[in-house]
């Protein structure tokens, strides 16, 4: 692709030839009419909208109505802070930029010593007698008369399974053993 400087483009502008200037003029007029129509539609929509005529000029110089300032209920989305950490861009000596992912939790570095101490004590067996963590059952539910879940009862029932190797080993059916 050929690249031109700004000066070269200005020189070429004078030398260019538009074969049909009436088509270009009609196209420009059509664009202007579309812009005018869009502005008229926006003005019509603005007039239809509820408005008591009481407006003010905001910091950007736009005329705005007051109805957005005194709502009955506060906006739910405006008060939520964005708690996601931004990814940090690291540039190495070669000029490559990599984005490092932020850590998931905000207090990731806070409990490292206690966590390591607890894991070490579990490995050594100081928490429980034989290296396991002992847990007390919830005694209030042990003697309840609550019905047993039927899915657990079905899981405990012994079922006969089909053994394919046994079926291949026998040449005859099981009914002929009598």
UniProtKB/Swiss-Prot annotation:
Acts as an inhibitor of cap-dependent translation. Competes with eIF4G1 and EAP1 for binding to eIF4E and interferes with the formation of the eIF4F complex, inhibiting translation and stabilizing mRNA. GO terms for biological process: negative regulation of translation. Residues 113-123 have a biased composition (Basic and acidic residues). GO terms for molecular function: eukaryotic initiation factor 4E binding; translation initiation factor activity. Coiled coil: none annotated. It comes from Scheffersomyces stipitis (strain ATCC 58785 / CBS 6054 / NBRC 10063 / NRRL Y-11545). Keywords: Cytoplasm, Initiation factor, Phosphoprotein, Protein biosynthesis, Protein synthesis inhibitor, Translation regulation. Pfam families: CAF20. Residues 61-155 are annotated as: Disordered. One of its GO terms (cellular component) is cytoplasm. Belongs to the CAF20 family. It comes from the Eukaryota. This is Cap-associated protein CAF20. It is found in: Cytoplasm.
């Amino acid at each position: 692709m050929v690249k031109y400087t700004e000066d070269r483009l200005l020189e070429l502008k004078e030398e260019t030839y538009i074969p049909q200037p009436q088509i270009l003029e009609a196209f420009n007029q059509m664009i202007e009419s579309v812009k005018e129509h869009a502005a008229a539609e926006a003005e019509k929509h603005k007039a239809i909208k509820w408005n008591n005529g009481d407006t003010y000029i905001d910091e950007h110089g736009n005329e705005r109505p007051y109805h957005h300032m005194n709502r009955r209920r506060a906006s739910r989305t405006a008060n939520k802070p964005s708690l996601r950490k931004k990814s940090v861009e690291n540039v190495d000596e070669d000029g490559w930029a990599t984005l490092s992912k932020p850590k998931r939790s905000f207090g990731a570095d806070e409990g490292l010593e206690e966590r390591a101490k607890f894991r070490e004590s579990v490995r050594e067996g100081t928490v429980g007698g034989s290296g396991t963590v002992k847990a007390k059952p919830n005694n209030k539910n042990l003697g309840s008369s609550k019905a047993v879940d039927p899915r657990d009862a079905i899981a405990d029932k012994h079922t006969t399974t089909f053994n394919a190797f046994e079926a291949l080993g026998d040449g005859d059916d099981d009914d002929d053993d009598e």
